């Protein structure tokens, strides 16, 4: 599933440094034919300890983790919604992503100038958010012009849409994003069709200095970002982009030792990948055989045939059953034979909603 998070941020906040760390740590693109091969797209493996344990259990010839795409979105400055900087290009790029990772500067460094002359994370956040709101306002106003005539004539669909558009316009006038507006399930379907930038889920990435990454509790800027994000019900990940680019060059034990020296349990990049994955409502199921153990990304709530289709359209078209076992039960049984003996392997049909951590063998006939 080619879902993408777009990385945005003002100049000199550490966005490019973080994105370069992502591309350095990049996954082998040959394993992921769906991924865009583009210099502004970084493909990363989704860290998952379960895959390693399955590999040890099954001992396959090949192990393939699931991957996630980050897009580096350049060109945002004050006035981007009016085409300033790389404004129009920026807006078209951000429309294509599924979620937004907003990198915010939370470090002080006199050698790195800030675009507005001072480090003010809330001002930075609001500058970008306002550009997105202004772009969405333009979309909504154009739509209102089109719909209002029909709404006045009491056209049922037009009245329904006009009500939604008016609600959105009111939010934008108060400088609030579309995701902050409550809609019914039916209304939400229409909002989705508008492809609004501010309806995309968001997480904030606070970029701190090297000496604060292990314990950012004394950083006032991080506290401000957390407080702002809490008002949006958004998550905050604390990273040091400079350190991440160093970590990206290390592997295995060397990487672990470096993290321990810094007093960090998990790299900021791994936290960012997991948080982005979760933000989009994604989960992982596994296929495990002698040839290959592989992790597959699916959207929570998907049924077995749809998940089978992620592997190949024939699997969905000719779906018969999904032989399924929970990852924990497979491990506890010491393998498929033990899990079957314990009665933990199930044959699931077309209506089965796949769960995170399911290990599945699909039966199909085309």
From Swiss-Prot:
Positions that bind ATP: 12-17
Domain TGS: 281-364
Family matches, as InterPro entries: ATPase_YchF/OLA1 (IPR004396), Beta-grasp_dom_sf (IPR012675), G_OBG (IPR031167), GTP-bd (IPR006073), P-loop_NTPase (IPR027417), TGS (IPR004095), TGS-like (IPR012676), TGS-like_dom_sf (IPR023192)
GO MF term (any one): ATP hydrolysis activity
Transmembrane segments: none
Keywords recorded for this protein, A-Z: ATP-binding, Magnesium, Metal-binding, Nucleotide-binding
Induction details: Weakly expressed during exponential growth in rich medium, stops at onset of stationary phase. In minimal medium is more strongly expressed and continues into stationary phase, part of the ychF-rpsF-ssbA-rpsR operon.
Domain OBG-type G: 3-259
Inactivation phenotype: No visible phenotype.
GO CC annotations on file: cytoplasm
Chain sites annotated for binding Mg(2+): 16, 36
Cofactor(s) recorded in Swiss-Prot or TrEMBL: Mg(2+)
Family matches, as PROSITE patterns: G_OBG, TGS
Keyword Magnesium: yes
Family under the similarity heading: Belongs to the TRAFAC class OBG-HflX-like GTPase superfamily. OBG GTPase family. YchF/OLA1 subfamily.
Function per UniProt: ATPase that binds to both the 70S ribosome and the 50S ribosomal subunit in a nucleotide-independent manner.
NCBIfam families: redox-regulated ATPase YchF
Protein name: Ribosome-binding ATPase YchF
Organism: Bacillus subtilis (strain 168)
Gene (UniProt): ychF
